[in-house]
């Protein structure tokens, strides 16, 4: 008989609730919707002495795993203890997020749990992990996910093709979702001298692979009175942030408001002339999807993970090409009618295609397919997903 409600463990994020990064947003959005449907969800948060430790939030249970608060060790220690805790916990499904934490996904698997891994991006390619040990550990996590996960979820066609070509491993393509946001008038942003449509916005983590240096360099040579806002927090990338400030020191049009959230974040999205995401590497960029939901005209690098989100409802430039980025920015600055068109169509397009409610149902359907003696709820699954699950089950029975 099918189990109506499941006990689910989430592992691999920093902490929930938070906007520390895209993974934290994803875990929070999924967990609160799963709880609302009657499932039990436990998020295994990192321990941080400087952060409060509530036992729960919005019906989500919160556990805190030992974390070595030292650069390079926080993620790996929290991932190990998170997977260990989930392995010995009373859970039907353990959902591990990201390749690094997947290094330990064999622990809950060893204890008889069913394990789902979501690859949010090929993290070993990111600039911050480009030392031999870190990159190799993340790559090994990728290999552990391929070997031990009952189901492997990816967010883009490019990642799906990568796992097929590299490992011969079938994956499930289930992109992330985005809420439907209501734009708001400028109030708090006026403290930075910002008004509606008088600035270009980047909003995200301050790390080299996001390409903020391309944007600053392209912008510096544009004859415009529109400001450039580089909004985002700094964790392990203070040196890179200092480099960005040095690049912009002679241009008082460039503003660094730091980490933003709440009303200030909403106002920045709502009133930007255009939003720019110049990334070299992405998983599935939630900030890009949020910008479109708020009604931004978006300009992004042409990597698959961004271009597949935008499609024809935004503008792309060649990755890493500062001249092309400058030309595309100049064109948008000179054509407000084009910008208005993209703004008008972005919210309906992105929210229809990437509803969090639909995404949650698809994840739950995969969970049910992974729980022993249960069949997926096929009415919740697209035909392609049903076919993939059925094929995999037939292969297992045939062994």
PLM regions and their residue ranges:
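Short hydrophobic beta-strand element within catalytic cores of glycosyltransferases
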Residues: 297-300
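Conserved acidic donor-binding segment of nucleotide-sugar-dependent glycosyltransferases
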Residues: 315-323, 331-337
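Short alpha-helical donor nucleotide-sugar binding micro-motif in glycosyltransferases
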Residues: 259-260, 267-272
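Glycosyltransferase donor-sugar binding loop
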Residues: 48-49, 178, 203, 227-242, ...
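Aromatic "clamp/platform" in nucleotide-sugar-dependent glycosyltransferases that forms part
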Residues: 280
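Nucleotide-activated donor-binding/catalytic signature segment of Leloir-type glycosyltransferases, i.e.
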Residues: 241-263
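A conserved mid-protein helix/loop that constitutes part of the nucleotide-sugar donor-binding site
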Residues: 25, 198, 202, 207-221
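Membrane-proximal helix-turn-helix segments that form the acceptor-binding/catalytic region
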Residues: 84-87, 110, 133-151
